[in-house]
C-alpha cells in the first residue's frame, strides 16, 4: 500500500460495536491519554481486522495485526509513539464516526492530510489527533504487511492490472510452461496450460502458438493421455501417476475441489493471455521437475520441466 490508506466506506463497521463493548470494561487512567488492552477478546477482534484488510489489499502475502489494542483519550497534541513494536503501520478506527473527530498526518513539513474516516498509515509519519470533544475515543493497533513477490504486472482490462507472481499464496490460477524431456512416445517439446486450484487444466498453447478452442481437462495426466502421446488408445496400454501424489502446479494443501475453471471469452482476456505468453516465453530460467510414471514393465518415466506463473483472477 501507499504510506496512507483511508477507509471511507465503513469497512470496519462490523467490529465497531465490539470495540465499543470492550471499551466498557476498560479501566481508564485519568492521567494517561490512552490505555492498551490485550486479551482473548482483542485477539478475536484482531482476527476480524485481519480478514477485513485481506479484502482491501489484493497483493499481500501475509497480514499481522497486533493483539494489543490501544484506546485513545483525546489529546490534540498527542504525536508520540502509541505502540512499541516492529510493525510498520498504525490502524486508527473511530468508535464514533463523527466528522468533528480528525487524524492529522504530515507526509512532509509543508503537507497535512486530515481525515475523519478510519485510516491506516506508516509509523514513519508524524501525526496527531484533533477534536474539541474530549469524550470521544478511538482505537489504534499495529499492522504488518508482507507483499507477494511479483514478477511483473499485466494489464487485464482498461482499469485493472494483474500481478504475475511466483508465489501460490493468494492466487487461484497457475500458468505452467511445460517442457518435455525427449521420449519416443512424445513428439512435442513445449506446451502451456492454466491450472486452477482443483487441478483442472486449460490447454493454452503449444510451441507458444495459442489454441483457439478452449479445451478443459480434469488433470494434467488427462492432457498427457489424451493429447501429447503419439499412440492411439493410450489408456488401454498403461496408466500414469506421480509417485509422490503431487499436483503439477499446486501444493496439496492449496488444492480445492469444485472450482470452476477460468475460460477466456472477451478480447481483453485473450489479450491478457497473449501478454502472459510473451512474458513466459522470455522468462523461464526457473523451473521445477515433475515426473509421471507409467505402470508398464519396466515402468515408463516421463520427465517435465515446469515454470510456474501464479495469478489471481476473479471469475467465479
From Swiss-Prot:
| Induction (free text) | Expressed in the early phase of the viral replicative cycle.
Q: What is the lineage of its organism?
A: Viruses, Varidnaviria, Bamfordvirae, Nucleocytoviricota, Pokkesviricetes
Organism of derivation: Monkeypox virus
Q: Enumerate the UniProt keywords alphabetically.
A: Early protein, Host cytoplasm, Host nucleus
The subcellular localization recorded is: Host cytoplasm; Host nucleus
Cited function: Plays a role in the inhibition of host NF-kappa-B activation. Mechanistically, blocks the subunit p65/RELA translocation into the host nucleus.
Q: Where are the transmembrane segments?
A: none
**Protein's recorded name:** protein OPG031
Q: Which Pfam families match?
A: Pox_C4_C10 (PF03336)
Q: Which InterPro entries does the record cross-reference, listed alphabetically?
A: Poxvirus_C4/C10
Amino acid at each position: 500500500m501507499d504510506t496512507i490508506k483511508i477507509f471511507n466506506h465503513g469497512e470496519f463497521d462490523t467490529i465497531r460495536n465490539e470495540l465499543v463493548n470492550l471499551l466498557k470494561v476498560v479501566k481508564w487512567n485519568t492521567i494517561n491519554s490512552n490505555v492498551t488492552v490485550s486479551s482473548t477478546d482483542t485477539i478475536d477482534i484482531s482476527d476480524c481486522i485481519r480478514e477485513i484488510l485481506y479484502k482491501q489489499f489484493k497483493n499481500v502475502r501475509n497480514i499481522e495485526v497486533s493483539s494489543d489494542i490501544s484506546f485513545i483519550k483525546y489529546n490534540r497534541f498527542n504525536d508520540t509513539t502509541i505502540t512499541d513494536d516492529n510493525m510498520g503501520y498504525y490502524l486508527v478506527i473511530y468508535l464514533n464516526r463523527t466528522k468533528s473527530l480528525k487524524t492529522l498526518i504530515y507526509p512532509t513539513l509543508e503537507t497535512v492530510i486530515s481525515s475523519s474516516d478510519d485510516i491506516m498509515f506508516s509509523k514513519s509519519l508524524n501525526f496527531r489527533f484533533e477534536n474539541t470533544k474530549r469524550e470521544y475515543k478511538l482505537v489504534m493497533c499495529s499492522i504488518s504487511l508482507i507483499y507477494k513477490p511479483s514478477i511483473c504486472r499485466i494489464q487485464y482490462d482498461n482499469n485493472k492490472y494483474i500481478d504475475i507472481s511466483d508465489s501460490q499464496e493468494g492466487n487461484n490460477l497457475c500458468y505452467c510452461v511445460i517442457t518435455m524431456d525427449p521420449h519416443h512416445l512424445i513428439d512435442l517439446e513445449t506446451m502451456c496450460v492454466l491450472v486452477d486450484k482443483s487441478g483442472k487444466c486449460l490447454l493454452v498453447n503449444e510451441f507458444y502458438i495459442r489454441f483457439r478452442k478452449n479445451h478443459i481437462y480434469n488433470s494434467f495426466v488427462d492432457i498427457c493421455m489424451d493429447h501429447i502421446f503419439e499412440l492411439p488408445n493410450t489408456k488401454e496400454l498403461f496408466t500414469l501417476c506421480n509417485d509422490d501424489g503431487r499436483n503439477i502446479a499446486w501444493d496439496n494443501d492449496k488444492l480445492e475441489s469444485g472450482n470452476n475453471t477460468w475460460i477466456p471469452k472477451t478480447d481483453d482476456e485473450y489479450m491478457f493471455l497473449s501478454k502472459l505468453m510473451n512474458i513466459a516465453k522470455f522468462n523461464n530460467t526457473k523451473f521445477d521437475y515433475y515426473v509421471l510414471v507409467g505402470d508398464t514393465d519396466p515402468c515408463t518415466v516421463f520427465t517435465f520441466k515446469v515454470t510456474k506463473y501464479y495469478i489471481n483472477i476473479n471469475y467465479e
